[in-house]
Amino acid sequence: MGHFVVQGDLPWILCSLRLVIMIIAGKVSPTSSDALFSVPVPSATSSPPEVYLPATFKLSNTQLAFFLQENRAPSYGSQRGHPLQRSESFVVFQTKELPAVNISLGPFTQDQTLSKDLLQPSSPLDIPGRLTVNWKVRAFIVQSRVYASNPLVQVLFYIAGRDWDDFKIQDKLPCVRLHAFRDVREIKTSCRLQGNLAQCLAQLDLPSTWFNVNVAPLGRRKSSGTDGLELTGETLQVELYYTLHDPDSNDECGESYPRRGGPSRGESLSQQPLLRIGSISLYQPSQEQLVVDKQLDKNLFLRLPERPLKPGETLNIYLLLVPNSTVEQFTLKVKAKKGVNLLSTKSRSNQWRVEWDMQSGAKHSIATVEASKIKGVSGDMAGSIEIMQLDFEMENFTSQSVTRRINWNIDYRGQNPTSDAEKVVTELTVVQKDIQAIIPLSMDTEIINTAVLTGRTVAIPVKVVSIELNGAVTDVSSSVQCKSFNEDIVKVSMNCDYVFVNGKETRGSMNARVIFSYEHLSAPLELTVWVPKLPLKVELSDNRLSFIKGWRVPILPDRRTARDSDDDDDDDRKVSRGCTLQYQRAQIKVLTQFHTTSSEGTNQMITMLGPDWQVDVTELVQDSLKVVDGRVAELADRTVLVANELGSSTLKVESPLAVEAVLGETQFSVVDEKVSIVELRVHAISGLALNLQPSPGNSHTMVAKATGLQTLSTLKQEASFSIWVYYSDNTAAPLSMYDPKDYNLNGTSADDKVVTVAQQPQQRWPVIIAEGEGTGDIVHVEMTISETCQKTKRKSVIASSSVFVKVRFGTDEDSEEDMEMETEIDTRMPANTRRPAIDSNVGGAGYEPSNEQPASVPIDYTNFPTISNPEEPTEEDEEDDEFVHSPRSMTDLEIGMYALLGVFCLAILVFLINCIVFVLKYRHKRIPPEGQANMDHSHHWVFLGNGEPLRTQSDLSPQTVESPSNTLEGVQTCCHGDHHSSGSSQTSVQSQVHGRGDGSSGGSTKDHGEDASSPTSKRKRVKFTTFTLPTEDLPYNSIPIANEEDIQWVCQDMGFQDQEELHDYMRRIKEIA
């Protein structure tokens, strides 16, 4: 009876549960039936693909400039990109004019020139109307030691980084003021930068008071070397600084060459900061000239001046005896080359007698000097004794300088101690001019070695000038010799006119040296050499390329036939009409850092621009990019990786100089997997805006920010598209990366009064033309398979999307306001994609397609338009053109709701199974209509009525002890009444009683003599008993009665008092059934 109540209320229960499930699902699911897949929530384990405005950036009017990329990765969860914006950092190293940044996207281009203030924030070399971004003033001290006998300070200034062929601004160069400080005293002078080298020599005469008595006199050098002086006591230091200032009204510096220092009258103090040059040492002059000693043997040595000689000058050379020597006589032979004449020889000691004889030849002159000690004359044996003085004359010559040699030989005439057999040679330098020093000047002080990447030599011109005592500056570049200190860092040309790198260098240096020599003088040229860090960092936008489901492309002759699959089980791979599935493509970017070693010799690496920046060198090495296995992939447009067939390979950057040398590489694979297009994001672009600004935190770098505009402000104005394709493997790529021959892009307008869509012959994609004002998702774009790959029954649409369009005509002021608003990006752009089906075999990480709003604007996922699906595909189309959706991670709320929903579904399923089992059992227990011969099972019938029963109670049921579960006894116990119904139905009952399946009637076990434990006795334990009404025309009904407890529950629950009430209740049950 209870089962009937549940069965009758089952539809109401199912409807209630259904309503509850729909309400719960509506709270956690989007309103659109497809939005659950099209707008997933952000995943906690994967970030969305980075998108940007796919515009092309270029730098022009530069000699050396790079785009940059920051090493610092964006913080987790931050907005990684915007499809209508793109920012690129860049740096300009060398330029002759103001650089310009160009951006282009489709038919739109935008150029902007960098302002001088942006490129050159502040510089003391600022010249009105001229660009001096690379200019640097360099200063060289001619002599670091100044003697009181010649207290002249000379400093050479020149501008490095300036083009030496630029003669237009020589008259606009500034003045340089030299400051000399000793304690609190200061003197200064000025000179004007001029000439093609933009150089000048500043000279200062130091006051004699600066050379005080505290300075120790010079000592003599006892060694024959020329490395330096052995000075006694401490020396005084003078600090040198410089400032820049403009010329006066007379185009002069005001302090041409003031001797004895001091500012000019009426001159104001310099407002420029003092820039340090270095320091010089002051020395008190001695009574003797600066000389050098040259040892002849263990007994005798020569003393001669160290300075260069002038033509016609007389040279005095002294011969001395070492202390405690026992030599008493010797013969000195002097052999001099042509140009050096021995004028005279005289004794310098009263202890020695000197005689000499001269013999002149064509090439040489030989003098023989006899020296003997005078007996009886005593002297100081503890000190050195000057024996004689030899005077030589330097003849005139025509060259700039010459070197004269004199050979010395001592003969003791057989007396002890014996003489040394080796001859001693002294070299004398004779110069036409009194040159103080030579100074190498390079046009720039730094070399960025891009030759390692390109194979093209990078060279810097070099000039060498000589500085004379009188202040003359002479170019001696054609007469110098040169040599690189380390050719693994920098090299120098054979003519010494430039230094260069050719790509074979292995390292850099902060002080790379090239030595230049001129006559007896030499000087180093110091440079900073930057080299790229190897291996290069080769980046791919996607290093795992897969098939794109549903996108078929023609097999061109240059495409690999291996892409054609013969697998008949995979219909999407089967090729018909010469077509195959498209592969994903990847964008290539090559990055590096330029670095050098420190000047301290510790091999500490110093990175150009700091460790936070990487330099984009893709344009430099794009000709050296190569795929190792060309069958797997190839390059398109030199920077796009195109897959050809399955496999793994390496993309490498080959060295342009060394065979089989690799500068950098990265691995990639073309896998036998399929990804689907989960979103086609399309934006209408009506123009481009470009903004240039300095990079925050770095004064050398700048940022170019491009923004795509959306508003159409004039009639017939055209707009193009910016399209990104999102894949189910959590990657995205601009559609412009793919060949336009591999797809068709069609656009339609929902309102031709606002915009129309037309295909221009010169344009890759359709264009939007403004016809009237309006806003909304007016344009619908479909991406279809190329015509050669379409099938007659195959749906060719790969993906589709609605495009947000805004047309507003107005004045120029309104347009400027729109530009400002569009710079902040319109957040109402939709992203719709056609997705016919879901393939559970292809999966990937979740992504966040709607990443278009700024961080401060929340995203309303429920406002996305419904998915465009204009026609229902056939079963064959769905099977062939099936799309894949990317599984995504769910939030905790969704996991909980879906778990609860699953429990409800499981409970409903269990309930339905229980009902089905019950119905099946119930149908098997029905009594067939009258006339049916037999039944499969025997039943015991309980008669309710006023007539006599067919059998007695003992015949209808077994004894209680034999069958405790006797059904009739259960009725007696429950109802406490007679076993007769209120109607006369004896005949009817008798006609409805049938025998058992074995042919016997339903009697007790006693009548048949069966044992209670026999298998047949179990057939008497009937669960259901059927009662029939007296009229045979009425349909029969059955009453299920389970056991005694069930019957007691039904009787007590219904509260029947007599048999009439029970009969009425049974009639109602029949009507309900």
UniProtKB/Swiss-Prot annotation:
Mention any Pfam family matching this sequence.
Answer: TMEM132_C
The residues on the Extracellular side of the membrane are: 34-899
Tell me which residues are glycosylated: N102, N324, N396, N746
Its record classes its membrane topology as: Single-pass type I membrane protein
Q: Which residues cross the membrane?
A: 900-920
The UniProt annotation puts the region (Disordered) at 246-270, 952-1024
* Task performed by this protein: Required for normal inner ear hair cell function and hearing.
Q: Under what name is this protein listed?
A: Transmembrane protein 132E
The signal peptide annotation in the UniProt record is 1-33
Knockout phenotype, as recorded, reads:
Morpholino knockdown of the protein causes delayed sound-induced startle response and circular swimming behavior. Morphants show significantly reduced extracellular receptor potentials and impaired mechanoelectrical transduction in hair cells of inner ear relative to controls.
Record topological domains on the Cytoplasmic side: 921-1073
Q: What is the lineage of its organism?
A: Eukaryota, Metazoa, Chordata, Craniata, Vertebrata
Q: Which GO BP terms apply?
A: auditory receptor cell development; detection of mechanical stimulus involved in sensory perception of sound; posterior lateral line neuromast hair cell development
Biased segments, Polar residues type: 952-970
Stretches with biased composition (Low complexity): 982-994
Q: Which UniProt keywords apply?
A: Glycoprotein, Membrane, Signal, Transmembrane, Transmembrane helix
Give the subcellular location.
Membrane
Q: Source gene? A: tmem132e
| Domain of life assignment | Eukaryota
Q: What family does this chain come from, according to its entry?
A: Belongs to the TMEM132 family.
What's in the GO CC field? membrane
